[in-house]
């Protein structure tokens, strides 16, 4: 499962080479699901804004439903699932592996673990405020619910974590 950044972004319906290797994985026998989960662009305002106040919730449900559909249709092997992404895709990877152990491997690039800390240190904290519908001192519970760090003791999936030493959006200590 290849997760796009954003969340206000989308995967295009095209085969393209990218640093995430979707094209390469396909040539090696992998089926690659690149879902446009709720919060993605291109599906209308409601689809985009449904995510407000529900990060680490409905988009995770969408992604897991997509993986389940791939298994049910015989496209994916439940014993050989992997998940990964960069930026918001890394964040969602963290959320997913803190929620379930169905994936046998994970790759989290610049993936946030703690949304309160993210608000405090990133270069554009406004999106955290928008999705949590408040500041850390007014939306502490919401930010905790959005943060996979609080479920980190549930993570059993072997995971590679990628960081950028000079990343102003998701500093290395956040990944």
Stretches found by the model and what they are:
Residues 1-175:
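Serine-hydrolase catalytic core recognition
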